[in-house]
């Protein structure tokens, strides 16, 4: 039979040679495989995972979506994120408006304002990712993180942008309705600017193609997501996910963006150094509060992409005091975690104040912000965590400033022999 004359299923594309039965209707055909698939969907209970991404289908299931106020959102973030007061307030308002909009849509109310996608500027380790993670936790919505540098447009080797939606769907246990109200955080977004140099020959060097591909899912589309990920191919099954109400938060360091802003403002009129490369960190942080859409476009982001983020806010570089606070104050502070680990061995772990500041100084020199704190403490305590479980004589360990700065051994306080027995 001529291949051109083969009859195919109008839904999956299988030909009559590949199926057992092909049932004809008015101008359409459906195969036995698709009939079984549809039958299985209809047999499912109404509370099971939806197979369509349409938000209107999910509305009856969640008529009373609870929305925290901006103050409540910030209060929860404060428990985990130190500093960044301006960023936390701005994001709290944006998130409140976003989920208020979703609640109105679920209750079939007319909504004239768009969703509040967020663009976070700031150096590595300033808390951008942690803010996004904390938001998802307190709002009890699915959350996933993607790295923009691994994404490619269609036709290039790399990760398809729609796989980000798949990861969110997986985080929602394949509950489409929940995924459609989740949060996606895309890190390193500045690395796909058109001016970014990239020597790879397997992807779009300019980054514009990746921005265009992301634009579609950020502005709102029905994504056909392969359940198992990977590239799309003919005759593949898809899960349809509507991205219109997914909150997108993107973050990046945007190195040298401050110079672009200073050039636009006129450096001599704002009191900065005559040398554009001689800004202090305080100067850079201040300049980033003045960022405009045109600055991001000059950096290399396309206008359409920037236009989808009506909330643009910067996270400032963390001070020494803030780094020390990160070590000790949050609910899940890393010092608290190590103290608990040693307490399970009946050992008291003590950090002197000077030692905490020494750790903060070391982290600041590493230029990776709060991210360096965990590595410094791991390297510091690794040998102790190896030895202590086998040594019942250890009662307490005192970490001093010279332990950090001069690599001197910590002070070990031992139990009296009679206390060991």
Swiss-Prot record:
Flavoprotein among keywords: no
Binding site for Zn(2+): 9, 12, 31, 34
One cellular component (GO) term of this entry: HslUV protease complex
One Pfam family hit: AAA_2
Source organism superkingdom: Bacteria
Membrane keyword on record: no
InterPro entries in alphabetical order: AAA+_ATPase, ATP-dep_Clp_protease_ClpX, ATPase_AAA_core, Clp_ATPase_C, Clp_protease_ATP-bd_su_ClpX, ClpX_bact, P-loop_NTPase, Znf_CppX_C4
Similarity comment: family membership: Belongs to the ClpX chaperone family.
Functional note: ATP-dependent specificity component of the Clp protease. It directs the protease to specific substrates. Can perform chaperone functions in the absence of ClpP.
Classification lineage: Bacteria, Pseudomonadati, Chlamydiota, Chlamydiia, Chlamydiales
Assembly behavior: Component of the ClpX-ClpP complex. Forms a hexameric ring that, in the presence of ATP, binds to fourteen ClpP subunits assembled into a disk-like structure with a central cavity, resembling the structure of eukaryotic proteasomes.
Protein's UniProt name: ATP-dependent Clp protease ATP-binding subunit ClpX
Xref: HAMAP family: ClpX
GO molecular function terms listed in the Swiss-Prot or TrEMBL record: ATP binding; ATP hydrolysis activity; ATP-dependent protein folding chaperone; protein dimerization activity; unfolded protein binding; zinc ion binding
Keywords from the UniProt entry: ATP-binding, Chaperone, Metal-binding, Nucleotide-binding, Zinc
Every ClpX-type ZB domain range: 1-50
Entry's Gene Ontology BP terms: cell division; proteolysis involved in protein catabolic process
Binding site for ATP: 123-130
PANTHER family: ATP-DEPENDENT CLP PROTEASE ATP-BINDING SUBUNIT CLPX-LIKE, MITOCHONDRIAL (PTHR48102:SF7), ATP-DEPENDENT CLP PROTEASE ATP-BINDING SUBUNIT CLPX-LIKE, MITOCHONDRIAL-RELATED (PTHR48102)
PROSITE patterns: CLPX_ZB (PS51902)
């Amino acid at each position: 039979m001529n291949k051109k004359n083969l009859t195919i299923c109008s839904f999956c594309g299988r030909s009559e040679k590949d199926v057992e039965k092909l049932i004809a209707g008015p101008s359409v055909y459906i195969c036995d495989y698709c009939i079984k698939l549809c039958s299985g969907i209809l047999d499912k209970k109404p509370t099971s995972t939806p197979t369509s991404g349409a938000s209107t289908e999910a509305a009856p299931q969640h008529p009373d979506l609870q929305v925290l106020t901006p103050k409540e959102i910030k209060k929860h973030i404060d428990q985990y994120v130190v500093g960044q007061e301006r960023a936390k307030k701005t994001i709290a308002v944006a998130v409140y408006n976003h989920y208020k909009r979703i609640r109105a849509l679920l209750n079939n109310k007319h909504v004239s304002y768009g969703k509040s996608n967020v663009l976070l500027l700031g150096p590595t380790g300033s808390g951008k990712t942690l803010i996004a993670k904390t938001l998802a936790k307190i709002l009890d919505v699915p959350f996933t993180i993607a790295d923009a540098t691994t994404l490619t447009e269609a036709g290039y080797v790399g990760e398809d942008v729609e796989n980000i939606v798949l990861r969110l769907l997986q985080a929602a246990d394949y509950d489409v309705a929940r995924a459609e109200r989740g949060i996606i955080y895309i890190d390193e977004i500045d690395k796909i600017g058109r001016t970014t140099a990239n020597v790879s020959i397997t992807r779009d060097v300019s980054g514009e193609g990746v921005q265009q591909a992301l634009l579609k899912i950020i502005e709102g589309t029905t994504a056909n997501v392969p359940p198992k990920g990977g590239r799309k191919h003919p005759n593949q099954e898809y899960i349809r996910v509507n991205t219109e109400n997914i909150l997108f938060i993107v973050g990046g360091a945007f190195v040298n963006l401050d110079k672009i802003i200073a050039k636009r403002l006129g450096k001599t009129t704002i009191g900065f150094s005559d040398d554009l490369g001689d800004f202090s960190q305080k100067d850079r942080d201040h300049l980033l509060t003045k960022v405009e859409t045109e600055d991001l476009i000059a950096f290399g982001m396309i206008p359409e992409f920037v236009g989808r983020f009506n909330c643009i806010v910067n996270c400032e570089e963390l001070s020494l005091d803030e780094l020390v606070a990160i070590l000790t104050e949050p609910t899940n502070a890393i010092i608290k975690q190590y103290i608990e680990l040693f307490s399970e061995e009946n050992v008291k772990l003590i950090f002197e104040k000077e030692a905490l500041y020494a750790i903060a100084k070391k982290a600041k020199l590493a230029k990776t912000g709060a991210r360096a704190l965990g590595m410094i403490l791991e390297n510091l305590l690794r040998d102790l965590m190896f030895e202590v479980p086998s040594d019942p004589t250890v009662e307490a360990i005192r970490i001093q400033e010279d332990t950090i700065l001069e690599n001197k051994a910590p002070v070990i306080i031992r139990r009296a022999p009679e206390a060991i027995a």
